[in-house]
Design a protein with these regions (language model features):
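Peripheral interaction segments used for macromolecular assembly
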Residues: 1-218
Length: 218
């Protein structure tokens, strides 16, 4: 899978999905992930009129969730390009289409994030995909939102926490680090020149700057 730029779930949901024949299949409505020390994208859930028309043509109710595996993706850029055509896709009618252990983004985004002592940190407001394919949490709410509001950058900064800092995902997302450690790391990251430049050009700045915590060069 070739990822041409860093992007997130929010941006992916705006992308058209095109099959190997160049046919527009629909748009991404949801995604599934697994976690085993790394957050791994597994499947996409589609929506859109083109897909619904196809389901109707093969006598399947269009309210079922069509899926395709992440391994079927050739390239992600302005569009999501698939290796296969629409006829090879599956739906949640298929037994085991979403295996046990996979979790939908729509469910993950409702979970609270807690530190190693189970103190609430905030929520996962998005998942960020770097060009090397690694996935990380974009964290908001709670102390994250409070800190960004204090410096007037709530809408200008995304705080990215790598999957390596996640201990487990169950009823909540538990981190391996403490709230104080996270806060200290974030405060240090917000002092970098790129963030200061956002502060100085707030009136003309239009993009969102991604601030990666606990970042280790690859």
């Amino acid at each position: 899978m070739d990822i041409t730029k860093s992007l997130n779930c929010r941006e992916l949901r705006d992308c058209d999905v095109v099959d190997s024949d160049g046919q527009k299949v629909g748009r991404i409505n949801d995604m599934t992930f697994t976690f085993d020390g790394q957050l791994k994208l597994e499947q996409f859930v589609l929506a859109g009129s083109a897909w619904e028309e196809f389901l109707e043509s093969i006598k399947i109710k269009p309210d079922r969730d069509p899926l395709f595996d992440a391994s079927m993706i050739r390239r992600i850029g302005d569009k999501v390009q698939l290796e296969s055509n629409v006829n090879t896709l599956k739906t949640t009618l298929d037994k085991g289409a979403i295996p046990k252990g996979e979790i939908r983004w729509s469910e993950l985004s409702k979970k609270q994030i807690v530190d190693l002592e189970e103190v609430t940190i905030g929520k996962a407001i998005d998942i960020d995909f770097d060009i090397d394919g690694t996935a990380s949490l974009t964290v908001g709410g709670g102390m994250i939102e409070e800190t960004l509001e204090k410096i007037g950058l709530k809408d200008d900064i995304d705080i990215i926490v790598p999957a390596e800092t996640i201990d487990s995902i169950g009823d909540q997302i538990k981190l391996k680090v403490s709230k104080d450690e996270l806060k200290l790391t974030m405060d240090q990251a917000l002092e970098n020149p790129e963030v200061r430049a956002v502060k100085d050009s707030r009136d003309v700045h239009r993009g969102v700057v991604k601030v990666r915590l606990f970042h280790k060069p690859r």
